[in-house]
Amino acid sequence: MKQPIHTDPAKPDDFSTEDWRRLLTHLGENADRQGLRETPQRVEKAWKHWTSGYDQDPAEILKVFEDGAEQYNELIVVRGIPVYSHCEHHLAPFFGTATIGYTPNGKIVGLSKLTRLVDCFAKRLQVQERLTIQIADTLMEHVQPLSVGVVIRCRHMCMESRGIRTPGEETVTSALLGEMRTNLGLRNEFLMLAREKD
Protein backbone atom coordinates (compact mmCIF):
# COMPACT_ATOMS: atom_id res chain seq x y z
CA MET A 1 0.00 0.00 0.00
CA LYS A 2 2.80 2.40 0.90
CA GLN A 3 4.24 4.19 -2.13
CA PRO A 4 6.27 7.16 -0.82
CA ILE A 5 7.70 9.75 -3.16
CA HIS A 6 11.08 9.68 -1.41
CA THR A 7 12.70 6.69 0.26
CA ASP A 8 16.43 6.05 0.20
CA PRO A 9 18.42 8.94 -1.37
CA ALA A 10 21.14 6.45 -2.29
CA LYS A 11 18.85 4.73 -4.79
CA PRO A 12 19.41 6.10 -8.30
CA ASP A 13 15.72 5.87 -9.27
CA ASP A 14 14.53 7.78 -6.19
CA PHE A 15 13.05 11.24 -6.75
CA SER A 16 15.24 13.90 -5.15
CA THR A 17 15.55 17.65 -4.77
CA GLU A 18 17.84 17.60 -7.81
CA ASP A 19 14.88 16.46 -9.90
CA TRP A 20 12.88 19.46 -8.72
CA ARG A 21 15.83 21.67 -9.71
CA ARG A 22 15.80 20.09 -13.16
CA LEU A 23 12.08 20.86 -13.44
CA LEU A 24 12.69 24.53 -12.63
CA THR A 25 15.46 24.66 -15.22
CA HIS A 26 13.22 22.92 -17.77
CA LEU A 27 10.61 25.66 -17.20
CA GLY A 28 13.23 28.24 -18.18
CA GLU A 29 14.02 29.39 -14.65
CA ASN A 30 17.34 29.90 -12.91
CA ALA A 31 17.18 27.43 -10.02
CA ASP A 32 20.08 29.22 -8.31
CA ARG A 33 18.45 32.63 -8.04
CA GLN A 34 17.55 33.79 -4.55
CA GLY A 35 13.80 33.22 -4.77
CA LEU A 36 14.18 29.64 -6.03
CA ARG A 37 17.30 28.48 -4.23
CA GLU A 38 15.39 26.66 -1.48
CA THR A 39 12.35 25.81 -3.60
CA PRO A 40 13.34 22.18 -4.39
CA GLN A 41 13.61 21.39 -0.67
CA ARG A 42 10.33 23.16 0.07
CA VAL A 43 8.51 21.37 -2.73
CA GLU A 44 9.91 18.01 -1.65
CA LYS A 45 8.64 18.61 1.89
CA ALA A 46 5.27 19.82 0.61
CA TRP A 47 4.70 16.77 -1.58
CA LYS A 48 5.63 14.45 1.28
CA HIS A 49 2.86 16.12 3.28
CA TRP A 50 0.35 16.18 0.40
CA THR A 51 0.82 12.44 -0.20
CA SER A 52 1.22 11.29 3.41
CA GLY A 53 -2.06 9.38 3.13
CA TYR A 54 -0.19 6.50 1.50
CA ASP A 55 1.52 5.91 4.86
CA GLN A 56 -1.74 5.76 6.82
CA ASP A 57 -3.82 2.65 7.49
CA PRO A 58 -7.59 3.38 7.44
CA ALA A 59 -8.21 0.35 9.66
CA GLU A 60 -6.08 1.92 12.40
CA ILE A 61 -7.97 5.18 12.08
CA LEU A 62 -11.39 3.53 12.46
CA LYS A 63 -10.83 1.64 15.69
CA VAL A 64 -14.20 1.43 17.44
CA PHE A 65 -14.77 1.89 21.15
CA GLU A 66 -17.43 1.18 23.74
CA ASP A 67 -18.51 3.78 26.28
CA GLY A 68 -22.27 3.34 26.24
CA ALA A 69 -22.75 5.56 23.22
CA GLU A 70 -22.68 2.49 20.97
CA GLN A 71 -26.32 1.95 22.00
CA TYR A 72 -27.19 4.99 19.88
CA ASN A 73 -28.88 3.77 16.70
CA GLU A 74 -29.94 6.94 14.90
CA LEU A 75 -28.19 8.68 12.02
CA ILE A 76 -24.87 10.36 12.87
CA VAL A 77 -23.75 13.08 10.45
CA VAL A 78 -20.54 15.12 10.39
CA ARG A 79 -20.42 17.84 7.76
CA GLY A 80 -18.01 20.54 6.73
CA ILE A 81 -15.03 18.16 6.84
CA PRO A 82 -12.18 19.84 4.91
CA VAL A 83 -10.98 18.11 1.73
CA TYR A 84 -7.60 19.02 0.23
CA SER A 85 -6.30 16.71 -2.49
CA HIS A 86 -4.52 16.59 -5.84
CA CYS A 87 -5.94 15.40 -9.14
CA GLU A 88 -4.02 12.42 -10.49
CA HIS A 89 -4.41 13.66 -14.08
CA HIS A 90 -2.63 17.03 -13.76
CA LEU A 91 -1.38 17.03 -10.13
CA ALA A 92 -3.54 20.14 -9.69
CA PRO A 93 -5.22 20.79 -6.34
CA PHE A 94 -8.89 20.23 -5.68
CA PHE A 95 -10.53 21.23 -2.44
CA GLY A 96 -13.85 21.52 -0.71
CA THR A 97 -15.83 19.77 2.01
CA ALA A 98 -17.17 16.32 2.81
CA THR A 99 -20.26 15.20 4.70
CA ILE A 100 -20.27 11.71 6.22
CA GLY A 101 -23.26 10.01 7.79
CA TYR A 102 -23.80 6.53 9.18
CA THR A 103 -26.33 4.58 11.22
CA PRO A 104 -24.53 2.60 13.95
CA ASN A 105 -25.04 -1.11 14.40
CA GLY A 106 -23.55 -1.55 17.86
CA LYS A 107 -20.24 0.15 16.97
CA ILE A 108 -19.29 3.81 16.84
CA VAL A 109 -16.11 5.74 16.13
CA GLY A 110 -14.96 9.06 17.51
CA LEU A 111 -16.19 11.94 15.38
CA SER A 112 -12.63 13.12 14.73
CA LYS A 113 -11.89 9.72 13.17
CA LEU A 114 -14.19 10.57 10.26
CA THR A 115 -12.17 13.71 9.58
CA ARG A 116 -8.95 11.69 9.74
CA LEU A 117 -10.41 9.11 7.34
CA VAL A 118 -11.16 11.82 4.78
CA ASP A 119 -7.66 13.24 5.20
CA CYS A 120 -6.08 9.79 4.80
CA PHE A 121 -7.60 9.25 1.36
CA ALA A 122 -7.42 12.91 0.27
CA LYS A 123 -3.65 12.96 0.83
CA ARG A 124 -3.14 10.65 -2.13
CA LEU A 125 -3.34 11.33 -5.86
CA GLN A 126 -7.06 11.12 -6.47
CA VAL A 127 -10.14 11.65 -8.54
CA GLN A 128 -13.13 12.89 -6.58
CA GLU A 129 -15.35 9.98 -7.57
CA ARG A 130 -12.91 7.38 -6.23
CA LEU A 131 -12.24 9.42 -3.10
CA THR A 132 -15.96 9.40 -2.31
CA ILE A 133 -16.31 5.64 -2.79
CA GLN A 134 -13.14 4.83 -0.82
CA ILE A 135 -14.37 6.73 2.21
CA ALA A 136 -17.80 5.07 2.11
CA ASP A 137 -16.50 1.54 1.48
CA THR A 138 -13.87 1.79 4.22
CA LEU A 139 -16.36 3.02 6.80
CA MET A 140 -18.76 0.22 5.88
CA GLU A 141 -16.02 -2.43 6.00
CA HIS A 142 -14.43 -1.53 9.33
CA VAL A 143 -17.35 -0.16 11.37
CA GLN A 144 -20.10 -2.29 9.77
CA PRO A 145 -22.94 0.20 10.28
CA LEU A 146 -26.47 -0.23 8.97
CA SER A 147 -25.96 2.58 6.47
CA VAL A 148 -23.31 4.93 5.14
CA GLY A 149 -23.62 8.14 3.17
CA VAL A 150 -20.85 10.37 1.82
CA VAL A 151 -21.23 13.62 -0.11
CA ILE A 152 -18.21 15.60 -1.34
CA ARG A 153 -18.26 19.07 -2.89
CA CYS A 154 -15.02 20.33 -4.46
CA ARG A 155 -13.55 22.95 -6.75
CA HIS A 156 -10.94 21.64 -9.18
CA MET A 157 -8.02 23.82 -10.22
CA CYS A 158 -7.46 21.68 -13.32
CA MET A 159 -10.79 23.08 -14.58
CA GLU A 160 -10.54 26.58 -13.12
CA SER A 161 -6.99 27.49 -14.16
CA ARG A 162 -6.65 25.63 -17.47
CA GLY A 163 -8.75 23.93 -20.12
CA ILE A 164 -12.36 25.06 -19.92
CA ARG A 165 -11.56 27.65 -17.20
CA THR A 166 -14.74 27.74 -15.14
CA PRO A 167 -13.96 29.67 -11.92
CA GLY A 168 -16.10 28.74 -8.94
CA GLU A 169 -17.67 25.66 -10.51
CA GLU A 170 -18.33 22.92 -7.96
CA THR A 171 -18.37 19.16 -8.48
CA VAL A 172 -20.63 17.12 -6.19
CA THR A 173 -20.26 13.34 -5.74
CA SER A 174 -22.08 10.95 -3.44
CA ALA A 175 -21.97 7.34 -2.27
CA LEU A 176 -24.84 5.63 -0.44
CA LEU A 177 -24.45 2.16 1.07
CA GLY A 178 -26.54 -0.26 3.12
CA GLU A 179 -29.97 0.93 4.22
CA MET A 180 -29.21 4.35 2.76
CA ARG A 181 -29.92 2.77 -0.65
CA THR A 182 -33.20 1.08 0.24
CA ASN A 183 -34.72 3.29 2.95
CA LEU A 184 -36.06 6.38 1.20
CA GLY A 185 -36.74 8.22 4.46
CA LEU A 186 -33.23 7.62 5.76
CA ARG A 187 -31.68 8.63 2.45
CA ASN A 188 -33.70 11.85 2.32
CA GLU A 189 -32.81 12.66 5.93
CA PHE A 190 -29.11 12.28 5.19
CA LEU A 191 -29.21 14.25 1.94
CA MET A 192 -31.15 17.04 3.66
CA LEU A 193 -28.55 17.23 6.43
CA ALA A 194 -25.76 17.11 3.83
CA ARG A 195 -27.02 20.20 2.02
CA GLU A 196 -24.84 23.27 2.08
CA LYS A 197 -25.47 25.67 4.93
CA ASP A 198 -27.46 28.74 3.94
Swiss-Prot record:
Its EC number is 3.5.4.16. GO terms for molecular function: GTP binding; GTP cyclohydrolase I activity; zinc ion binding. InterPro entries: GTP-CH-I_C/QueF (IPR043133), GTP-CH-I_N (IPR043134), GTP_CycHdrlase_I (IPR001474), GTP_CycHdrlase_I_CS (IPR018234), GTP_CycHdrlase_I_dom (IPR020602). GO terms for cellular component: cytoplasm. Pathway: Cofactor biosynthesis; 7,8-dihydroneopterin triphosphate biosynthesis; 7,8-dihydroneopterin triphosphate from GTP: step 1/1. It comes from the Bacteria. Keywords: Hydrolase, Metal-binding, One-carbon metabolism, Zinc. Zn(2+) binds at C87, H90, C158. It catalyses: GTP + H2O = 7,8-dihydroneopterin 3'-triphosphate + formate + H(+). One of its GO terms (biological process) is tetrahydrobiopterin biosynthetic process. It is an enzyme of class 3 (hydrolase). Belongs to the GTP cyclohydrolase I family. Homomer. This is GTP cyclohydrolase 1. It comes from Janthinobacterium sp. (strain Marseille).
